[in-house]
């Protein structure tokens, strides 16, 4: 059976520099793990308890595409108190920063577009426009 090949735009993507660094540093006690932006602390007990309660209650199904309405409302309230008023309808919850960046870029960038990126920047960000068929110029 012939394996499918990735589109040329995907095959040309640079490997994740963050993953390269993580692979070298993982498991070493003399290295501080700053590569993925995750805490070195265990997830707080109230969050773990809420996750366990949701699992026990069978709350394990897909949610609305834009995120749970209660979560979107809470984020809107928080942002409104912190900065300026924002409606819950303007909030979209994603599963990661990369997903959010990909969705936002898909809304703005298409094949043949040229994206100018002010560097330094998170290395993975430079690859998103390339996936969409755009060229990237770093300045």
Protein language model annotation of sequence segments:
Residues 5, 15-17, 124:
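Intrinsically disordered, low-complexity sequence elements enriched in Ser/Thr/Gly/Pro
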Residues 106-139:
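PLP-dependent aminotransferase-like
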Residues 100-101, 125:
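Short, hydrophobic alpha-helical packing/hinge segments within bilobed ligand-binding/sensory domains
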Residues 11-96, 103:
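N-terminal small-domain helix-loop-helix segment of the aminotransferase-like
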Residues 1-10:
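Generic N-terminal amphipathic, Lys/Arg-enriched alpha-helix
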């Amino acid at each position: 059976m012939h394996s499918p090949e990735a589109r040329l735009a995907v095959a040309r993507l640079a490997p994740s520099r963050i993953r390269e660094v993580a692979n070298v540093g993982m498991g070493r006690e003399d290295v501080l793990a700053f590569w993925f932006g995750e805490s070195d602390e265990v997830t707080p007990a109230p969050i773990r308890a809420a996750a366990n309660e949701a699992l026990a209650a069978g709350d394990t199904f897909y949610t609305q595409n834009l995120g749970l309405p209660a979560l979107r409302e809470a984020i809107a309230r928080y942002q409104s108190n912190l900065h300026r008023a924002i409606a819950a309808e303007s909030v979209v919850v994603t599963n990661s920063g990369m997903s959010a960046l990909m969705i936002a870029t898909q809304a703005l960038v298409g094949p043949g577009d040229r994206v100018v990126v002010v560097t330094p920047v998170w290395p993975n960000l430079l690859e998103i426009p390339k996936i969409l068929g755009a060229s990237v110029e770093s300045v």
